[in-house]
Each structure stands twice: as structure tokens, then as C-alpha cells.
């Protein structure tokens, strides 16, 4: 049954060249990424690495992310999204954890995302910083 899902993650957008290398017609890309990085599925995962994807409504394509999922709640209420860069302390902590998967991570590539969406439709791609 469909309901709202809330996620809070430290997020790294997987580069297109990696996606292009893994993509094939026989398997779902998300399954290939789970195998490639040997991480858990995102459902109910907390304090661990997972793969998430989201539909980018601007280009109608999916974006894929390696996330350190801090929190997951099924049955949350309402749609919202917040994205910010990590503080220096957060970046120092999480960039070390992500170094297991990627050697060099730029200061602006890791983001803290906190959002809720209705899972009866495609999960949105939550990564871009919005200027106010």
C-alpha cells in the first residue's frame, strides 16, 4: 500500500560515466549498483550505506545516489525537501566513510538531504541546492 516515506541521508550523486559502464539491458541499474558497491537496499535502512534513485523532473531521467542513510520512516506525513552542504565537521566525518567507495570527493559533492515523498509515484531526485 502507498504512503509517505521520509528519508534523511548524506548523499553523493553517482557520476554518469560510472552509470554508463554498468548499464546493461538484462538487469535493473539499481540492482547493478547494489552489487557494485555491496550495500543494502534502502527500505528501512538506517545508519548504513545504500543506493537510492530519483526521477529528475527537469530532464525526465533517473539520477542515482550512494547514500549514507541516517533515517528512514514509512508512514511519515507530507511532502517536503531540504538540501544543504555539509558543515566542515560533517564533511570530515562522512568523506572518510565515502572514501571506501570513491577516492576523491569534492567539498560540494556530499550533501545532507532530508525529504518526504508519496511512494505511490516516482521518488523525486533530491540533490540540487536551491538559491534563495
Feature-to-residue mapping (PLM):
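Short, extreme N-terminal segment that most often corresponds to the first beta-strand
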Residues: 1-42, 114-119, 127-132
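Low-complexity, serine/threonine/proline-enriched polar segments
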Residues: 29-77
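Charged interaction segments
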Residues: 57-132
